[in-house]
């Protein structure tokens, strides 16, 4: 397991039992990235838990988080876990995506309740990665964002709801999005 240190201003899943299910599902969706040269973006990375779970399967993981204290905790956590292929950047995803030179092979999204900033969505989609894992804590913002992904060439392959807070209306959802291949379309020839 990972050693994790969190601060009072950092977000972290409070239900550790279902958080384990959530993180394991995300890790399973990522699967084998196919090599140590692959780069993963973990956008809205918090204290870096997901990034660190992905690190053994990737050449590099870049986490982006707006809360500076969470980024500092992520850096310390990666060091404590002996992970030297994790980089964490403090900043707004919308702005940081314009500054990062690396291009991802896969993207993991775990945005706040309001979902992804509408101006960040086109930037994320423009990378054209084959797979995106989207973790959402609010179904309405998830649906809104998924519509944009679907309109731009992605499809939902898998989705799992994780009940983080039993007896409440809150649910976390883990979605695997995949780029539609040519095989996903039906062509009709009119003679």
Predicted regions, residues:
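Rossmann-like S-adenosyl-L-methionine
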Residues: 1-191
């Amino acid at each position: 397991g990972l050693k994790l240190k969190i601060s009072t201003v950092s977000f972290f899943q409070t239900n550790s039992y279902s958080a384990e299910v959530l993180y394991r599902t995300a890790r399973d969706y990522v699967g084998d990235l196919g090599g140590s040269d692959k780069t993963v973006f973990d956008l809205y990375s918090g204290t870096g838990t997901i990034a660190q779970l992905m690190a053994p399967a990737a050449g590099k993981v870049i986490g982006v988080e707006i809360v500076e204290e969470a980024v500092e905790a992520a850096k310390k956590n990666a060091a404590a876990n002996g992970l030297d292929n994790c980089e964490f950047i403090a900043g707004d995803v919308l702005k940081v995506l314009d500054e990062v030179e690396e291009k991802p092979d896969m993207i993991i999204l775990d945005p706040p309740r309001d979902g992804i900033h509408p101006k960040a969505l086109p930037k994320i989609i423009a990378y054209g990665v084959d797979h995106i894992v989207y973790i959402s804590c609010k179904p309405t913002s998830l649906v809104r964002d998924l519509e944009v992904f679907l309109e731009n060439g992605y499809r939902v392959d898998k989705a799992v709801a994780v009940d983080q807070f039993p007896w409440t209306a809150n649910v976390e959802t883990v979605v695997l999005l995949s780029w539609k291949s040519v095989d996903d379309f039906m062509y009709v020839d009119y003679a």
